[in-house]
Amino acid sequence: MMKYNNLFWAFSVLSLLGCSSSQEVKTIPDSLSGIYPKLAYYNNEGECGTGAVVPWADRLWVITYGPHLPEGSSDKLYEITPDLKQIVRPESLGGTPANRMIHKESGQLFIGPYAIDSLGNVRSIPYNIMPGRHTGNARHLTDPSDKIYYGTMEEGLYEVDVRTLAVREIYEDANFTKREKSSKEYGPIGAMLPGVHGKGLYSGQGVLVFTNNGEGSNEALSKFDIEAGVLAEWDGKDWKVVRRNQFVEVTGPGGIYGNTNPETDPVWATGWDYKSVILGVRDAKKGWTFFRLPKSSHSYDGAHGWNTEWPRIRNVGTEAHPDYLMTMHGMFWKFPADFTADSSAGIRPRSAYLKVIGDFTRWNDRLVFGCDDSALKGFLNARKAKANFPGPGQSNSNLWFTSLTKPDELGPATATGSVWDKDPVKAGEYSEPFLFSGWDYRMAWVKNDSSHSVSFAFEVDKKGNNQWTPLREIKVEAGESVHILFDKEELGEWIRVKTDAPTLATVSFTYTDSDERSTTSDEIFEGLAELDCNHSIGGLLYSLGNNRRALGIVSTQQKDGKVVECGYYEMNDTLKLVRKDDPESRDFIVEKCAIPSKVVTVESSSVLVVDDKGRRWRLPLGDEAYTGLMDQNALRICREVVTERDLFSCMGTFYELPAENADGYAKIRPVATHNYKINDYASYRGMMILTGVDPEEGKKNPHIIVSEDGKAAVWAGAIDDLWELGKPVGHGGPWNDTQVASN
């Protein structure tokens, strides 16, 4: 068990007279960084994600979901008016829905188990009639004017009459199928298809396409690099496995309406394996063709498939001027509306993000992202760096409103991916095409794990028209590796590689852009206490449960080198910090949310981190002042602030840290470096909350919220504001005057 240093709280018995008590009251805005606290939604389940977000009937319609609830739940259907009033619809049935489709012929939006007409009237299909975790809708193969398909995460398939809502079961949902379960399996596993955890459903070219992104084995709960998931299609009679990888989105240029010309329009599917993102496109004559893209974040990995939510490709332009936005592995992508196997040019990285996004849309000339922010149940995301830290008291999430250009304005588009990773390769065998255009700097790492030398020949498709030309060829000796730096003149939409001899090969690509960020934090962070501040207001944070829907804060102040407790405060959707007399909540936060000690070891060369498997990792050093603060347990180091991944704070740098089942520290991603004394951080109503504030410095900053008595203060914004803290910087290495043995 990790030891806790109680010195931080020993000063709570000191006189509260040491806390400041004067504060000029300022107006608190309705929203911060595009997040409206009043629009947050809660449920009584282990998770409260956003399943779908759709503009319809002059309203924005939103459904939420809890984890694995095929017969309904406390989740709701929300109707949001143009002036941002949230209406909880009485027809709500809950469940785990993420489906949405607009059926033009009947003038209805199908979202979750609901059908909504053009006037906003809602009809529900009860779960006892159509059970399962509704994951997708699709146009009917033979009667698209009168019927639609509903698909569930466990291979249930239903045909629904759009006018009467009569339901015909085609395939039973596996949650309700009696079958003997193996001790090596977890959860309900369908008998028709490999893989579990269904995600996408779409129809076109005479088939219904279904995806899932997980594997139903105990092995999948801890490993990220085993076979998992499926891309499959159904012709109305039989199922066919197209590819055995983890797939999520399946759609086409028709998007939420279905393809306009279903016989010929392409069908797109996104997925991944442990090597890279996979993009599939179906042609009516050629069938499926696959491409690969790099990953910006690895926090979506995991063979169980739980870490992804619902990645999407959606038109966020207009009907006259389509503009497709793709979310995949922590990156916003520009996706061409006319993408096919023979016209594949135009996919481009936009920027990296930290939010977990379940769906998104354009509404009233803004983008609206439905997020999965704070889950009561930590699922598999446990690690000793957090000790036994509790999840939020109640699951909650929110919408994130942004400008239309925000997907171009967040983190740098650094990305990595492989076409081969210690894979057996035959002589003359081509890799799948890998995206080659869209970054300032591109490199490849090539490894030959055979007993003989091998030549690797790279080719490019310059225009995305499936016409390939030689780029360069390199010879790699047995057991050796080579780095390749590509020049800016080496152009192409896609790159592929082949060898002249059989080998065990690795070919991995790393792409980066020039990071134009300053090392100075943006003005939205004014009022966070800098390292040399000796009068900052800190505090421990916890999102309360029992439907209180408030944030609890045990406020502290640093004064004359001592930490003094200033009282217990709460904040609700008005963003006012109010002092409360609630010793039970205060005691819970002090005991359960204390900052653990010895999470990392600061050495002369770098910061040593030992993960839960005993693997040793090193991170760069920052300002020396952080060493003392970390030793005093004055800085939170690790916490989950978006579902199923952690935010890691070390030596003044924030990192995105994947769950251990997604390879953890091996795939850590630096976000930003700052010069602030951030005491604690948490998610609440979709916002990122920080403590460690200098109220006087932040008195003009709307992101700094201070109680009327001046004894409690927080910074509030969005997690993706963190990119603006400053470019990641650091120094150090694995050794510093270290005695090293050979090998």
State where each predicted segment sits.
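Residue-level signature of beta-propeller blades and closely related beta-rich strand-turn architectures
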Residues: G66-H68, Y114-A115, M153-E154, N212-G216, ...
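Repeated scaffold domains used in trafficking and secretory/extracellular systems
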Residues: E45-A52, S92-S106, I129-S145, A174-Q205, ...
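Surface-exposed loop/turn elements that mediate protein-protein interactions on large endomembrane-trafficking
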Residues: P29-G34, S74-S92, P113-R133, L157-K184, ...
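Blade-level signature of beta-propeller repeat domains, shared across WD40, Kelch, NHL, RCC1
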Residues: G358-D421, N679-S742
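Short, conserved, GDST-rich strand-edge loop motifs in beta-rich repeat architectures
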Residues: Y65-D75, F210-G229, V267-W268, S276-V281, ...
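Beta-strand-rich domains and repeat architectures in extracellular enzymes and scaffolds
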Residues: L39-D75, G94-M101, P433-L435, D440-R442, ...
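Entry beta-strands of beta-propeller and related beta-repeat scaffolds
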Residues: R59-V62, S106-F110, P144-Y149, S203-T211, ...
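Noncatalytic modules at the cell exterior or secretory-pathway interfaces
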Residues: K488-A505
